[in-house]
Swiss-Prot record:
Binding site for UDP-N-acetyl-alpha-D-glucosamine: 10-12, 124, 166, 196, 296
Keyword line: Cell cycle, Cell division, Cell membrane, Cell shape, Cell wall biogenesis/degradation, Glycosyltransferase, Membrane, Peptidoglycan synthesis, Transferase
HAMAP family (UniProt xref): MurG
Main localization of the protein described in the UniProt heading: membrane
PANTHER family reported for this sequence: GLYCOSYLTRANSFERASE, UDP-N-ACETYLGLUCOSAMINE--N-ACETYLMURAMYL-(PENTAPEPTIDE) PYROPHOSPHORYL-UNDECAPRENOL N-ACETYLGLUCOSAMINE TRANSFERASE 1
CDD domains linked: GT28_MurG
Regions crossing the membrane: none
Protein name: UDP-N-acetylglucosamine--N-acetylmuramyl-(pentapeptide) pyrophosphoryl-undecaprenol N-acetylglucosamine transferase
UniProt-listed GO biological process terms: carbohydrate metabolic process; cell division; cell wall organization; lipid glycosylation; peptidoglycan biosynthetic process; regulation of cell shape
One Pfam family linked to the record: Glyco_tran_28_C
Pathway: Cell wall biogenesis; peptidoglycan biosynthesis
Originating organism: Alkaliphilus oremlandii (strain OhILAs)
């Protein structure tokens, strides 16, 4: 089996592709897998570290308005299509899978024109521009959220698979998680995470909670992100950081921290939501503003509408508001249980298996 995977720009596009590659290797150890990305995207570092070869094509993002930049981008796109054609013809894949980002455009388009089986995976509720364009060309469209169905025209191509995540999120037990994070207090644990790079506004809201409200009805475990750790820690009054509250730059055992918490406060990236719902945790989602096509707000609202999360817009966030929302949830065990049940219902714990099955079905189709 020979497979090309293409996805890039951000971790949200790259990690699902790596999960799919790992599942293929698990089922077919001799499978030949090649990634196609861009040299200036995160994939140029992440993919080789994961142990997979990668080749690069030329691509540039498009602005929503007519501009000189778009003229240049169109020229680069034509070059990228030619480069993708050369790579695909040399590698001779059985199937080409795209996981989003502008790099998928030339790769999946050319694969479809060459008569090769194609599939794209969409991580967010509101699909990215590239995947919306590829809708007409590809054979199958795998969705992480059922709510995304309404944004695609070719309904017969759609299948809800979920977003693949690390298996250890499902493997960690409550006992193991509690042994690491609930040894020194019986108070409810609130995990606050702003994503791999941290979230400045979320960190500031938690600092405000610690300095002004000094909560004693719950414990805070704040993961600031390495870049924001020092400045965040320096903003917290010494007396506010009681022994029951913890501040870390990063945690290496997120599956344990997530399993141990009673409530998680986080941004609304697709992978984060997939992890939270896989273990069925109640959440307060704070979608990051100014993301591509505001996709985090769509993700957050989908969870909020199903009762799995409470949503706070980033421009409305403050320590006072966050503290009140935390207490409203944590203070009512029935609310927590109801949110946990809704969250677990939305979780898809076998996403990689589902995507692999769809890939196999495409390959077996005559």
């Amino acid at each position: 089996m020979r497979v090309i995977l293409s996805g890039g720009g951000t971790g949200g596009h790259i990690y699902p592709a790596i999960s799919i590659a790992n599942k293929i290797k698990e089922q077919h150890p001799k499978a030949e897998i090649l990634f196609i990305g861009t040299e200036n995207g995160m994939e140029s570092e992440i993919v080789p570290k994961a142990g997979y070869p990668i080749k690069y094509v030329t691509v540039s993002y498009l602005k929503r308005k007519i501009s000189l930049h778009n003229v240049k981008s169109a020229a680069m796109l034509l070059k990228g299509i030619a480069e993708a054609r050369k790579i695909i013809k040399e590698f001779k894949p059985d199937i080409v899978i795209g996981t989003g980002g502008f790099v998928c455009g030339p790769v999946l388009y050319m694969a479809s024109k060459l008569g090769i089986r194609t599939m794209i995976h969409e991580q967010n509720v509101f699909p990215g521009l590239t995947n919306r364009i590829l809708d007409r060309y590809v054979d199958r469209i795998a969705l992480s959220f059922k709510d995304a169905e309404k944004y695609f025209k070719h309904k017969n191509k759609l299948v809800v698979t979920g977003n693949p995540i690390r298996s250890d999120f499902m493997e960690v037990t409550e006992v193991e998680a509690s042994a690491r994070y609930k040894t020194d207090s019986d108070l409810p644990l609130v995990l606050v995470v702003g994503g791999s790079g941290g979230a400045l506004k979320i960190n500031r809201a938690v600092v405000e909670i610690l300095n002004q409200y000094q909560p004693n009805k719950y414990r805070l475990l704040l993961v600031t992100g390495k870049r924001l750790y020092k400045s965040t820690l320096e903003s917290i009054n010494a007396e506010s950081l009681q022994s029951k509250h913890k501040v870390f730059a990063y945690v290496n055992d997120m599956p344990h921290a997530l399993k141990a918490c009673d409530l998680i406060v986080c941004s609304a990236g697709a992978i984060t939501i997939a992890e939270v719902t896989a273990v069925g945790k109640a959440s307060i989602l704070i979608p990051k503003a100014h993301t591509a096509e505001n996709h985090q707000e769509y993700n957050a609202n989908a969870m909020g509408n199903k009762g799995a999360a409470v949503v706070i817009r980033e421009d409305e966030l403050s320590g006072e508001i966050l503290n009140k929302k935390i207490q409203d949830i944590i203070g009512n065990i029935q609310v927590v249980k109801k949110m946990e049940a809704a969250s677990y219902k939305e979780g898809i714990r076998d996403a990689a298996d589902r995507i692999y099955s769809e890939m196999q079905a495409l390959l077996e189709r005559k």
